[in-house]
Amino acid sequence: NVNIGVWTKLFKAKTIKGIEYDKAIRINEDKLFIFEALMKAEKYVVYDVSKYNYIQREVSATRKFDDRWFDTLDVADYMLELIKKEKPELLRWAEINQIKVYYWLLLMLFRNHDAVEMYSKQYNRVVCLLKKAKLLKISKYISRNMFLQILLIKVSEPLFKRIKGRG
């Protein structure tokens, strides 16, 4: 499990040469940058020690929900496609990442008043992917709560919405 903050990393110049931030991605651009760097890296080392204090403000851009958050779906989809082409042996992990990202965004939609209605097209995209998820294949890699909620979406999306207070 690698933290996605670029500010927690040191890279050799040759590893990140040619990798640029995608200016079209408004949130999760650092996750994509790290992913591309790891795809190029010959090896990496995780040194689990805190040497940096990080403060998150309540008014931070990453606290407020808006359409930028849907960029996380595009990043997860891109990562999956790149893994399929370049490192198929990691496909299961890319699929799990994609499902977790979509699930997390679904929860964000329900936590923000009127977001499900306001972003109905994106909501449908999220639900469609989660309904197709092969839960038994990934059940040991996700939490029991996530498993049960995705299962409920597969069985009865209206019941899921009612339980979440939006149906």
Which residues fall in each region the model found?
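Donor-binding/catalytic cores of nucleotide-activated saccharide
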Residues: N1-Y44, I55-F65, W69
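Extended, low-polarity segments enriched in aliphatic/aromatic residues
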Residues: E42, V49-S50
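A general structural signal for well-ordered secondary-structure junctions
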Residues: K43-Y44, E89, L136
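Catalytic core of nucleotide-sugar-dependent glycosyltransferases
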Residues: S50-E58, R63-E89, W104, M108, ...
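All-alpha amphipathic helical-bundle segments outside canonical DNA-binding/catalytic cores
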Residues: E89-N97
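GST superfamily/GST-like fold recognition
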Residues: I99-Y102
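Membrane-interface aromatic/basic loop that binds lipid-linked glycans or pyrophosphate carriers
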Residues: R111-G167
